[in-house]
Every structure is written in structure tokens, then in C-alpha cells.
Curated annotation (Swiss-Prot):
Disulfide cross-links: none
One GO CC term, this protein: ribosome
Pfam families in UniProt: Ribosomal_S11 (PF00411)
Entry keywords, A to Z: Ribonucleoprotein, Ribosomal protein, RNA-binding, rRNA-binding
Database matches in PANTHER family: 40S RIBOSOMAL PROTEIN S14/30S RIBOSOMAL PROTEIN S11 (PTHR11759)
The UniProt record lists the keyword Nucleotide-binding: no
Protein name, as recorded: Small ribosomal subunit protein uS11
Self-association state and partner proteins as the record states: Part of the 30S ribosomal subunit. Interacts with proteins S7 and S18. Binds to IF-3.
Top-level taxon of origin: Bacteria
Gene for this chain: rpsK
HAMAP family registered for this protein in UniProt: Ribosomal_uS11
């Protein structure tokens, strides 16, 4: 009879990280907030759409605020205290996401805009006619 390897239940220990980075991707349609450690390994993330907002309500500053709060609360389990913030994109949730992370209790050490700017690359979308 073959011996079945026993799978003993091991408690998973969460690594403790004091300093982290918050990547805020604010597009016109959604806002994605990811909190990582210094090496870039994701600790927690949240989106406006995943926070219960659908359609045009995803692209509001309030939806970005809720997403940033959810990502920030989830990252507190790892012991993150200080955040360096990287903001990408022109969306409406840029500032409100930063303010929400500050309100959760993080000390924001640095804010950097990493929006990619083309050196005359792809053709942009046509202008809207309303």
C-alpha cells in the first residue's frame, strides 16, 4: 500500500514591510491602486470597478477614493507605514486616491508622476463631438 504524504496545516506568516510603494493608475474609465513593497512585489490592490462601481460611476473621484481605501486597509496587514506614491494617467481619480491613502493613516514620503508621454508615437483617438 502506497504511503500518502501528510499535508500538515501550516500557518502562513505574512512578511512585515515598513516602507511600500503605491501605484495609482488613473485612466478615464477606471482607477487601479496597487500597493507594493520596495522590490515591486504586490501586497494589495483594488480597483474602482471591483469596489462596486459600474459604468460611468467607475470614473469618478469618489470611486477612486474607495478603491484607495480598500487597497490601503488590506496593505496594513503587512505593517506598511510609509508610502511612496507613483501616479500614472490623466484620470479624475488621481488626487482623491492620494488623499484617501493619507486619510487611512499612511505617511506619504514622495509623490511622483510617471505618466507616459509619447515622443510622437501612436496616433491619438479622434476628438469627441458632443
Amino acid at each position: 500500500m502506497a504511503k500518502v504524504p501528510s499535508r500538515s496545516p501550516r500557518k502562513r506568516v505574512r512578511k512585515q514591510v515598513a516602507d511600500g510603494m503605491a501605484h495609482i493608475h488613473a485612466s478615464f474609465n477606471n482607477t487601479i491602486v496597487t500597493i507594493t513593497d520596495r522590490q515591486g512585489n504586490a501586497l494589495s490592490w483594488a480597483t474602482s470597478g471591483g469596489s462596486g462601481f459600474r459604468g460611468s460611476r467607475k470614473s469618478t473621484p469618489f470611486a477612486a477614493q474607495v478603491a484607495a481605501e480598500r487597497a490601503g486597509i488590506a496593505a496594513q496587514d503587512y505593517g506598511v507605514k510609509n508610502l511612496e506614491v507613483f501616479v500614472k494617467g490623466p484620470g479624475p481619480g488621481r488626487e482623491s486616491a492620494i488623499r484617501a491613502l493619507n486619510a487611512v493613516g499612511y505617511k506619504i514620503t514622495n509623490i511622483t508622476d510617471v505618466t507616459p508621454i509619447p515622443h510622437n508615437g501612436c496616433r491619438p483617438p479622434k476628438k469627441r463631438r458632443v
